[in-house]
């Protein structure tokens, strides 16, 4: 079995430039966008060549959902939000990254 740390992974240069490293989850790198107006987090699966959700295998898609739910739950509680927004955009950065 290959450990996630052994899989080659390169973060898109725009994400690298515009974000602050927060931590590593089992599948994803967790970043905070460098934007003082909003608490804006990103989950990026540490897998090379992943541009769409369907590029992940079933186990990784499930893990991504678990990590997203975990992040959303904590953000909702911390900020006392009534509704959370999640987006998967790719119009500027093609690498799969989920906005929270």
What are these model-derived regions, one by one?
Residues 1-100:
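HIT superfamily nucleotide-processing domains
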């Amino acid at each position: 079995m290959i450990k996630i740390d052994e899989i080659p992974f390169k973060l898109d240069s725009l994400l690298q430039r515009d974000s602050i490293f927060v931590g590593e989850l089992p599948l994803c790198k967790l970043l905070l966008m460098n934007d003082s107006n909003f608490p804006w987090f990103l989950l990026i699966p540490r897998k090379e060549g992943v541009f769409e959700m369907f590029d992940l295998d079933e186990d990784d898609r499930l893990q991504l959902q678990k990590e997203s739910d975990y992040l959303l739950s904590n953000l909702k509680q911390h900020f006392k939000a009534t509704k959370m927004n999640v987006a998967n955009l790719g119009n500027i950065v093609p690498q799969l990254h989920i906005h929270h």
